[in-house]
Regions:
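Secondary-structure end/capping motifs
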Residues: 1-77
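Conserved C-terminal helix/tail region of periplasmic/extracytoplasmic solute-binding proteins
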Residues: 63-132
Length: 132
């Protein structure tokens, strides 16, 4: 639910993190903090058309990951994905009122500092730091 909230209002999600962890605010500042929150939401959200909700595990991706880290020596033996992952909790974990979360995110009262951050500017450069 928290990532859904952040998807609808990354500035508000950043404010909540800053209040809970002031060191994050002092280390990142408003703009980088918001951009980081947006990147996290983007990665964790993925393509919701292909997924069955927040937290859904794609077996093929996990198999490839475990195979790769085994190949580079990070694991000593193969991992059976079926023994370490489950999607059994995805449906109940995603059983919340998305429209209410969106409404709560949109009405969140922002500080002046976070209100000034231009989300469209961040989106415009969102992939400019991608390693090619």
């Amino acid at each position: 639910m928290g990532l859904e909230f952040g998807e609808h209002n990354p500035r508000a999600a950043t404010d909540i993190v800053f209040k809970a962890l002031p060191i994050v605010k002092s280390n990142l500042g408003a703009e980088l903090g918001i951009e980081s929150m947006m990147q996290l939401a983007n990665v964790f959200r993925g393509n919701m058309e292909e997924r069955q909700g927040w937290g859904y595990h794609d077996w093929g991706s996990w198999k490839a990951y475990f195979k790769t880290i085994r190949k580079i020596g990070q694991l000593k033996r193969n991992v059976n994905v079926n023994k370490v992952l489950t999607n059994d909790f995805i449906a109940p974990a995603n059983d919340f009122d998305v429209s209410q979360v969106k409404a709560d995110a949109q009405k969140y009262s922002l500080s002046a500092e976070l209100s000034k951050v231009d989300i469209d500017k961040i989106k415009g450069r969102f992939y400019s730091n991608v390693v090619k």
